[in-house]
């Protein structure tokens, strides 16, 4: 407008032409603006329609999204509740498992300690077992030796009984011989009133041997009259001759009495040996049950008796031959009874 006011026209026509051109120019501008406005309105209507459509779509999507959001919120709340419940349950379970774990660890430690103690006790028991086995073997060995010793002593005891029977028989025979000697002396007294010094010495020796049977005597091999009694059978024959009425020589009578004294001494020695062996057995096995020992001794005794019952021959003569060693047996005497019972070990005391 300042430019238009500053314009100076030369004439009115120039001014009119100028203003007409300006008016045409503005008119054209207004038409263009109107056209642009119409185009803009049409475009804006189109945009508005599009925007409304988009708005409707967006609102629909928003409604869907909102409903979905509400559903998801509800699901989230339910999941949170479930999570809290599960978390509480898991917490309780974890606390319970932790308590169980601590208890299990304590039990495991106790069991490991108990296992170690059991292993130590097992080792101790194995050592004690080995020691017990060794002591048991030693004890069984000693017990077997004692049983064998007892079996041998029982056989010795049986022989002792046989010897005692023989001694008793010999005592009876000696008594009969003394009576017979007294009768013969009474018969010979009227014939000879004077007794020789040699006969007195013999009678004195006979009486001394009868009064003291256990006195130490010289062996049979050193006696002067041993030649007449070199075997039990000849000794028995001499006694039979005495019973038949044939007078015996004083030397034979003295030898018979000496044999009786030897028998008595050996019987006493056997009794002392038996007592010492019994004491030895009691000292060696004080804690052994008596039933098992007695059972085994009874079995051994039965076996020995069975084996001894099989042997043939006179037990008295065999006991005399075995224990007293009078002399060699005659050829017709069986040697089966002289053998030791099988399984019996002779122990020198």
From Swiss-Prot:
Pfam families membership: NUDE_C (PF04880)
Biological process, per Gene Ontology: cell division; cell migration; centrosome duplication; centrosome localization; chromosome segregation; establishment of chromosome localization; establishment of mitotic spindle orientation; microtubule nucleation
Compartments where located: Cytoplasm, Cytoskeleton; Cytoplasm, Cytoskeleton, Microtubule organizing center, Centrosome; Cytoplasm, Cytoskeleton, Spindle; Chromosome, Centromere, Kinetochore
A molecular function (GO) term: microtubule binding
Superkingdom of this protein's organism: Eukaryota
PTM per Swiss-Prot/TrEMBL: Phosphorylated in mitosis.
Main location: cytoplasm
Keyword Phosphoprotein (UniProt): yes
Keywords: Cell cycle, Cell division, Centromere, Chromosome, Coiled coil, Cytoplasm, Cytoplasmic vesicle, Cytoskeleton, Kinetochore, Membrane, Microtubule, Mitosis, Phosphoprotein
Recorded coiled-coil stretches: 22-189
Entry GO CC: centrosome; cleavage furrow; cytoplasm; cytoplasmic vesicle membrane; kinesin complex; kinetochore; microtubule; spindle pole centrosome
InterPro entries xref list: NUDE, NUDE_dom
Keyword Phosphoprotein attributed: yes
PANTHER family named in the record: NUCLEAR DISTRIBUTION PROTEIN NUDE HOMOLOG 1
Subunit structure: Self-associates. Interacts with pafah1b1.
Function statement: Required for centrosome duplication and formation and function of the mitotic spindle.
Family stated for the protein in its record: Belongs to the nudE family.
Protein's recorded name: Nuclear distribution protein nudE homolog 1-B
Organism expressing this protein natively: Xenopus laevis
This protein's encoding gene: nde1-b
């Amino acid at each position: 407008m300042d430019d238009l006011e500053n314009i100076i026209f030369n004439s009115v026509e120039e001014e009119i032409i100028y203003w007409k051109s300006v008016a045409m120019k503005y008119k054209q501008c207004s038409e263009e603006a109107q056209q642009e406005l119409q185009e803009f309105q049409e475009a804006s209507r189109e945009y508005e329609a599009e925007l409304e459509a988009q708005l409707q779509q967006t609102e629909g999507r928003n409604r869907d999204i909102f409903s979905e959001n509400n559903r998801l919120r509800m699901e989230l709340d339910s999941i949170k509740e479930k999570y809290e419940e599960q978390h509480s349950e898991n917490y309780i379970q974890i606390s319970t498992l932790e308590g169980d774990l601590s208890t299990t660890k304590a039990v495991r430690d106790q069991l490991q300690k108990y296992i170690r103690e059991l292993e130590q006790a097992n080792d101790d028991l194995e050592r004690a077992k080995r020691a017990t086995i060794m002591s048991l073997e030693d004890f069984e060995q000693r017990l077997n030796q004692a049983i064998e010793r007892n079996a041998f002593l029982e056989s010795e005891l049986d022989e002792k009984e046989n010897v005692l029977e023989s001694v008793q028989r010999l005592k009876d025979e000696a008594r009969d011989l003394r009576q017979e000697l007294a009768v013969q002396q009474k018969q010979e007294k009227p014939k000879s009133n004077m007794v020789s010094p040699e006969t007195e010495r013999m009678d004195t020796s006979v009486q001394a041997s009868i009064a003291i049977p256990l006195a130490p005597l010289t062996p049979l091999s050193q006696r002067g009259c041993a030649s007449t009694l070199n075997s039990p059978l000849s000794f028995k024959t001499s006694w039979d001759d005495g019973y038949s009425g044939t007078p015996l020589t004083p030397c034979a009578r003295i030898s018979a009495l000496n044999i009786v004294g030897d028998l008595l001494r050996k019987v006493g020695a056997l009794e002392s040996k038996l007592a010492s062996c019994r004491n030895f057995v009691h000292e060696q096995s004080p804690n052994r049950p008596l039933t098992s020992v007695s059972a085994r001794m009874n079995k051994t005794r039965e076996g020995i008796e069975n084996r001894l019952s099989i042997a043939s021959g006179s037990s008295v003569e065999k006991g005399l031959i075995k224990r007293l060693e009078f002399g060699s047996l005659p050829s017709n005497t069986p040697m089966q009874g002289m053998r030791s019972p099988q399984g019996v070990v002779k122990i020198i005391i």
